[in-house]
């Protein structure tokens, strides 16, 4: 059997002319000079979805009354057990919360509390910048949650309205 030596000129040309290297370098140069798509974060902020789940808030009715009826559905549905509610009956027979605490160190921002609430009292608002220096600041009480609701009410109401067709 005679062995013939066939030279693959295409493979040899690729090897000696470094075509793969040149292709890779060209691709790198293409992306180097292309316009950048990053956001200069502290100075610019990207758009948020109406369904964005950020910092929690308790809402009030337009007349100032708290929406929460102390049904404790949010406490029951929370997989992280981050919500603690105590309630008392009022003189008119309805129930209202005396204590509404959320341990934000446990919260996984799943949104189940917001979905379970029959009166849209607990919502996850648009704020995602709530870093703290101590862990104690991440234990939200009823007053802090109501304050968040008052601060973000306009945007929360708009987001709930935009999300209404999908609920």
Swiss-Prot record:
Name of the protein: NADH-quinone oxidoreductase subunit I 1
Sites binding [4Fe-4S] cluster 2 sit at: 78, 107, 110, 113
Its cofactor is: [4Fe-4S] cluster
The protein's UniProt keywords, in alphabetical order, are: 4Fe-4S, Cell inner membrane, Cell membrane, Iron, Iron-sulfur, Membrane, Metal-binding, NAD, Quinone, Repeat, Translocase, Ubiquinone
Query: What is the recorded function of this protein according to its Swiss-Prot or TrEMBL entry?
Result: NDH-1 shuttles electrons from NADH, via FMN and iron-sulfur (Fe-S) centers, to quinones in the respiratory chain. The immediate electron acceptor for the enzyme in this species is believed to be ubiquinone. Couples the redox reaction to proton translocation (for every two electrons transferred, four hydrogen ions are translocated across the cytoplasmic membrane), and thus conserves the redox energy in a proton gradient.
Quaternary state and partners of this protein?
NDH-1 is composed of 14 different subunits. Subunits NuoA, H, J, K, L, M, N constitute the membrane sector of the complex.
Spell out the family assignment given in the record's similarity comment.
Belongs to the complex I 23 kDa subunit family.
Residues annotated for [4Fe-4S] cluster 1 binding in this entry: 68, 71, 74, 117
Q: Which GO terms describe its molecular function?
A: 4 iron, 4 sulfur cluster binding; iron ion binding; NADH:ubiquinone reductase (non-electrogenic) activity; quinone binding
Q: What is its EC number?
A: 7.1.1.-
